[in-house]
Design a protein with these regions (language model features):
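Bacterial N-terminal signal peptides that target proteins for export
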Residues: 1-11
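Bacterial N-terminal signal peptides
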Residues: 10-19
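Flexible loop/hinge segments at secondary-structure junctions
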Residues: 24-339
């Protein structure tokens, strides 16, 4: 009972703070830290072009879902798509905003970005605590000729409800049977080992601080923080580097036309050049909002994103949505939202 009260109190306090932000903004949003770098750039450029202000709070996908369900913001953002039945129950609509990638990041002396190779099974075993030193035979077998230290591995995971975690654990569940059986997938799971950081920002900070650390973040966080990310073996058996090109290769396998309410997860995608932990960010809005002007302004903002925001996304190593998908989104708006 006390835990439930504390949860309701925390949501209420956050809602109140977001409401204060709303008074000064034309559009308010909250959710995934995954897209915060590009959302910040979009918002600044949109303001410069239109004089309209978009206030986006990076609170994690779980927080974004809670806030849009509570109608505390004009839109929520999540890297974990909601299933059609959950959307219907909450009176929500959902559509994609941009595509990016989740990358393992490490702090291992002598290991530069892109030099360490991992596969899904070994990555899962590290996060299970089964592989606990950097010179473990499983890691050494994937990295012949690389001098690996004897040091202990410290796992860093998310402490908050996270779409980044959803895509990471969804991938591990597809490629590591032990992970699927013992942990599974979700925005929040019972982590077998490690320490928790809040947001992509928190995970990046901990990994940078902890010698021997490993975590997972969206690529732009790794690049901005000059962190060493790993290469990954994909579903085709090829080792690939994270980039907008390998994210786009994974996205090419997505069949959005058959995805009701755009419910689609593209981890472990086919293709020789596909990054295996590629993810989509989704925007959630109320179908019958208390503030119709907020929804109208939200759709105007994302219409601008789809037509004028590609360069900003590419600059930060995200992948803009293809024109065919944008056309589907506009048709979805016309069918499901007031206009």
């Amino acid at each position: 009972m006390m835990h439930s009260f504390k949860t309701r109190l925390a949501v209420g306090v956050l809602a109140a703070s977001l409401a204060l932000c709303a008074q000064a903004a034309d559009v308010t949003g909250a959710g995934a830290s995954f897209i915060y770098p590009v959302m910040s750039k979009w918002s600044a450029d949109y303001n410069a072009a239109t004089k309209k202000q978009v206030n986006y709070q990076s609170i994690g996908s779980g927080g974004g879902i809670a806030q849009i369900k509570a109608a505390s913001v004009d839109f929520g953002s999540s890297d974990a798509p909601l299933k059609p039945e959950e959307l219907a129950a909450a009176g929500l609509a959902q559509f994609p905003s941009v595509i990016g990638g989740v990358v393992p990041v490490v702090n291992v002396p002598g290991i530069a970005a892109g030099t360490l190779k991992l596969d899904g099974k070994t990555l899962g075993d590290i996060f299970l605590g089964k592989v606990s030193t950097w010179n473990d035979p499983a890691i050494a077998a994937l990295n012949p000729g690389v001098k690996l230290p004897e040091g202990k591995i410290t796992v860093v995971h998310r402490s908050d409800g996270s779409g980044t975690s959803f895509n990471f654990t969804n991938y591990l569940s597809k490629v590591n049977p032990d992970w699927k059986g013992k942990v599974g997938e979700g925005t929040a799971v019972q982590w077998p080992t490690g320490i928790g950081g809040k947001g992509n920002e928190g995970v990046a900070a901990y990994v940078k601080q902890i010698k021997g650390g490993i975590g997972y973040v969206e690529l732009s966080y790794a690049l901005q923080n000059k962190m060493a990310y790993t290469a990954m073996k994909n579903a085709a058996g090829k080792f690939v580097q994270p980039s907008d090109e390998t994210f786009a290769a994974a996205a090419n396998s997505a069949d959005w036309g058959t995805a009701k309410d755009f419910y689609l997860v593209m981890t472990n995608a086919a293709g020789d050049n596909a990054w295996p932990i590629t993810a989509t960010n989704f925007i959630l809005v109320q179908k019958k909002p208390k503030n119709p002007a907020g929804l109208k302004n939200t759709l105007e903002f994302f219409r601008w994103v789809y037509t004028k925001g590609d360069a900003q996304a590419k600059q930060l190593d995200y992948v803009p949505l293809p024109d065919t998908l944008v056309t589907q989104i506009e048709a979805y708006w016309a069918k499901n939202l007031p206009h």
